């Protein structure tokens, strides 16, 4: 999906997956294996994975919504504010993990629906995110990678609030975050858990859930986020202000 409409697309290297796996999990970065209900350890450089005991266990087009909250292009001030809030704490170790140049290879541009679908497909083809534990650091590394390699301004990767499945706010990004159950016995396996990337990533979530990235091709056809949670788009939702604020309050989501 997405290939026929593109003239040319760059090829993210498989190294992106390795760098994301190393982030927060050290040499023990891993993937959630749904079929096994457990943890798969990635051995750097080998391209192989080794099973370990579980430690954690209607279609729509872009113009179909009159009130679809398409992002207003960010101002330079907003871009700088984003960088200060989200990128300043990315240290030299993160630069090494990302493995890209300090400057973008192409002119900066805003993410579009078509680009989001294409990037989602490319990353899937490379095995980059499926089953990978989510963490704030991996989130930032992905932002940096796409900014430097593709020139995509890193203001697009946001997800709905929990509990439960977190859907991408940007229509066209086909990766959602799905909570996985951590078996109680796994939490008692001290040696593995202290090294296990998921034991770090769950603390990145205010609801304490351990999340993994999961590819969902239907997100290219249905704006699930806007259908289920229009209140999260605030003034851009098309709802009366009192209504969307009431819904956010009922869900315990802060708003201004």
Swiss-Prot record:
GO molecular function: GTP binding
Biased composition (Acidic residues): 88-97
Segments for region (Acidic): 88-96
InterPro entries: HIV-1_Nef_core_sf, HIV_Nef
Signal peptide as annotated in the record: none
Membrane topology: Lipid-anchor
Residues linked to a lipid group, N-myristoyl glycine type: 2
One Gene Ontology term, aspect cellular component: membrane
Chain residue ranges for the region called Disordered: 33-100
Protein family (similarity comment): Belongs to the lentivirus primate group Nef protein family.
Domain comment quoted from the record: The N-terminal domain is composed of the N-myristoyl glycine and of a cluster of positively charged amino acids. It is required for inner plasma membrane targeting of Nef and virion incorporation, and thereby for infectivity.
Descriptive protein name: Protein Nef
Protein species of origin: Human immunodeficiency virus type 2 subtype A (isolate SBLISY)
């Amino acid at each position: 999906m997405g290939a026929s409409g593109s003239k040319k697309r760059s090829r993210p290297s498989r190294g992106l997956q390795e760098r994301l796996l190393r982030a927060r999990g050290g040499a023990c970065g891993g993937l959630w294996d749904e079929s096994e209900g457990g943890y798969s350890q990635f051995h750097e450089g080998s391209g192989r994975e080794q099973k370990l005991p579980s430690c954690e266990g209607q279609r729509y087009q872009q113009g179909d919504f009159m009130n679809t909250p398409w992002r207003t292009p960010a101002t330079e001030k907003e871009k700088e504010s984003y960088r200060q809030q989200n990128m300043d704490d990315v240290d030299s170790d993160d630069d090494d993990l990302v493995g890209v140049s300090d400057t973008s290879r192409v002119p900066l541009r805003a993410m579009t629906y078509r680009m989001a679908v294409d990037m989602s497909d490319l990353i899937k083809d490379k095995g980059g995110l499926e089953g990978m534990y989510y963490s704030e650091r991996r989130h930032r590394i992905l932002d940096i990678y796409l900014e430097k390699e593709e020139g995509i301004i890193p203001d697009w990767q946001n997800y709905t609030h929990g509990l439960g499945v977190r859907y991408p706010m940007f229509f066209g990004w086909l990766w959602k975050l799905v909570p996985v159950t951590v078996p109680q016995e796994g939490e008692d396996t001290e040696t593995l858990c202290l090294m296990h990337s998921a034991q770090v990533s769950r603390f990145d979530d205010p609801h304490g859930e351990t999340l993994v990235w999961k590819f969902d091709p239907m997100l290219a056809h249905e704006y699930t986020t806007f259908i289920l949670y229009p209140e999260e788009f605030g003034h851009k939702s098309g709802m009366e202000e009192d209504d969307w604020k009431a819904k956010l309050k009922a869900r315990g989501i802060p708003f201004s």
